[in-house]
Structures are given as structure tokens and as C-alpha cells.
Amino acid sequence: MLISNTYNQHFPQLTQEQIASNATKKVICGMSGGVDSSVSAFILQQQGYQVEGLFMKNWEEDDDDDTDYCTAAADLADAQAVCDKLGIKLHKINFAAEYWDNVFEHFLTEYKAGRTPNPDILCNKEIKFKAFLEYAAEDLGADYIATGHYVRRAGDNENAKLLRGLDANKDQSYFLYTLSHKQVGQSLFPVGEIEKPIVRAIAEDLGLITAKKKDSTGICFIGERKFKDFLARYLPAQPGNIRTVDDEIIGRHDGLMYHTLGQRKGLGIGGLKNAGDEAWYVVDKDVENNELIVAQGHDHPRLFSKGLIASQLHWVDREPIRESLRCTVKTRYRQQDIPCVIEPIDDETIRVIFDEPQSAVTPGQSAVFYLGEVCLGGGIIAERI
């Protein structure tokens, strides 16, 4: 039996009754080959559950895609090594077709329309908490699935609530707002109750191969490649003019899809005559005319919005908001909470008014709402106001 003193210091000892109850429950833990899922599986073991791992392959590499292939192969090898060390079975499943149909094609459509989508949110919605959850329950007989996400849940089954992770720096509730209370109730999030350094310390105690493995960053199907190079393989770029808010053409862009609101670097328009020293920022995209709109200064009024319109709403309790609600919102990951008021337009659309104007609110991204620690849900930013 593997032992971690760090685990013993940070997790309460369960009663024999709790362990006996957990022992009747089968949990399939999604194993990514990273430290968070590795430690999640160990925690579940310590709590008495019947634990098995599952490695998902969500992307098919091209034959010339050596970098990504090696990454996927290495991740699988690490996941297998961890499961071997923990003494648990590792299942393998290929969800690449589901990923292409339900995540990647939507990603391309949104970029084509000049919006900036977040595929990780869609991946959680369509793959990890739908395809994986269904496969685990129906084919593997799971009572729960588990992942290495930094979130917590309160309550069970129909009453489950999604809470922020204990580690504010790692909280991933922003990426899970589309989950229903039912999905939350069928999921366990073991590392959501602790901070990242403790996760690594537990992995070190156990001698896991993933203990010092760096966290994966960026979009899963792009890996370490340059985003621009990857996107160019699927969407032909349409170069166009860069126009100032004063209606002056000052340069050319190589495709609207490569730029996002609030962007400062990589515009190629520095050193313009009589332009002053202030940096240029993207303040808008004119999709109809294929023009990138820019202005000088990080506090230019065109960068700011007093609110937003959101659609494609998902509330964790699946009850639409039908009256004004004061809460907080994040319009991008790791942003400080913004105090706001939600004003329902209809069951599918809301108007959100910020207490103070906010910079670089980006259509296509998600607005996610909170009441204290509870993640209420969210929607896609349709427009800024």
C-alpha cells in the first residue's frame, strides 16, 4: 500500500462506515498523464472507492505530425505508469470522431465568423462530461467519474452545486459552467479540495512519474505548435486593412482570426510618423469589410464596455434566470470577479451590466457567473454594450 504523509496531513480520516460505503462505488478516473489526474486516482483509492483509470484520445494526428504524436504517446505511457504504480486498471478509448464533430468543427466555424471561441469549455461539455461520462456509466459500470479539475461540488445527485476550487490560482470552474447539476452529481473532483503545491507533494511522496511534469497549457489539439501555423492548415487566411478609430488605414493584417480584442503585440504597426509613443491595441473587428480596428492606449474608450449580451445559456441547476440578479462575472479565465447585474431578456438571452466598464470583452468567449463560491453557469458573449 502506497503511503503519503502529505495526504494524511491534508485530508480527514474517514470513518469505517464511510470507507465501507465508498467501497461499494466504482469510480472511473480520467487519466491524462498529468499530475492532477494521477493524484486524483490515489486520493480516491485512499477514500475506499473501487478505482479504475481511463485514457481518452481526442485528436488524430496527421502522419507528419510527429510532435503531437510523441506527446500523446508519452502521456499514455505516463498514465499507464501511474496506474501500474497505484495497482489499478487503465482503460483506453478513442473519442476523436466525437471531438471533431462536436468541438473542432464548431471551433473553426467561430473563428471563421471573427469570434474567439474557447474549445476547452466545449470539450468538457461534449467529451469529458458527456461522451466519457456515458461510456463510463454504460460500458464500464461506473457510479461516478472523476477528473483532475480544480473545482469542488456540494450536495449530491439532483441537488449538486458546482463550487470554485479551493486553490484560487488554479480554480477551473470557468471551464465547467456548462455542466448540469446532474453531471456534477455524477462526478468527483478530488484535487479541488487542496492547493496545487500539495498535489505535487503527494505525487512526490508516492514517487509518481508525473510528480514534476509541467502542466499542459494551450488548446489540447494544437499542443506546442504555433497557433497561427495550426489554424492556417484549416482556414485560409484573408489579409485586409488595419484601420484606426479615426478612419485612417495604417497597415495590413494577415487574417482577422489571428487577432483578438485587447491585443497589443504582433500588429506590425509600430513607429508610425506622428503617432506618438502610445502602443496600438485591437479594439474591434469589422468582419464584413475584413478590417482590424485599432486605437492607441490601453485605456482607450473603444476598448471598454459597460456590459454584454450573452446567449447559449447554461445554468448548473438548469433553471433559467427570470428576474434581475446581482452577482459577479468572469469574461475570461483567471480574471478577477466583476460585480454585475444580470437582466433576463428571455430564457435564452441575458443582458449583463457591469458596475464599472471593463476592457476587452470578447464575443465568442464565455461569461461565467458566480454567487460567492457557487458557479451559477454562464453563456457565450454575443456582443458587448
Curated annotation (Swiss-Prot):
Compartments in which it is found: Cytoplasm
Site (Interaction with tRNA): H149, Q365
InterPro entries associated with the record: MnmA-like, MnmA-like_C, MnmA-like_central, MnmA-like_central_sf, Rossmann-like_a/b/a_fold
Alphabetical GO biological process terms: tRNA wobble position uridine thiolation
Active site residues per record: C123 (nucleophile), C220 (cysteine persulfide intermediate)
EC number: 2.8.1.13
Recorded GO MF terms: ATP binding; tRNA binding; tRNA-uridine 2-sulfurtransferase activity
Stated name of the protein: tRNA-specific 2-thiouridylase MnmA
Keyword Cytoplasm tagged: yes
UniProt-listed Gene3D superfamilies: Adenine nucleotide alpha hydrolases-like domains (2.30.30.280), HUPs (3.40.50.620), Translation factors (2.40.30.10)
Record CDD domains: MnmA_TRMU-like
Native source organism of the sequence: Haemophilus influenzae (strain PittGG)
Disulfide bonds: C123-C220
Record has RNA-binding as a keyword: yes
SUPFAM superfamilies: Adenine nucleotide alpha hydrolases-like (SSF52402)
The encoding gene: mnmA
Summary of the function given for this chain in its UniProt record: Catalyzes the 2-thiolation of uridine at the wobble position (U34) of tRNA, leading to the formation of s(2)U34.
TM helices/strands, residue ranges: none
GO cellular component: cytoplasm
Family: Belongs to the MnmA/TRMU family.
Location, primary (coarse class): cytoplasm
Binding-site residues, ATP: G30, M31, S32, G33, G34, V35, D36, S37, M56, G148
Region (Interaction with target base in tRNA): 118-120
UniProtKB keywords: ATP-binding, Cytoplasm, Disulfide bond, Nucleotide-binding, RNA-binding, Transferase, tRNA processing, tRNA-binding
Organism lineage string: Bacteria, Pseudomonadati, Pseudomonadota, Gammaproteobacteria, Pasteurellales
Region named Interaction with tRNA: 170-172, 332-333
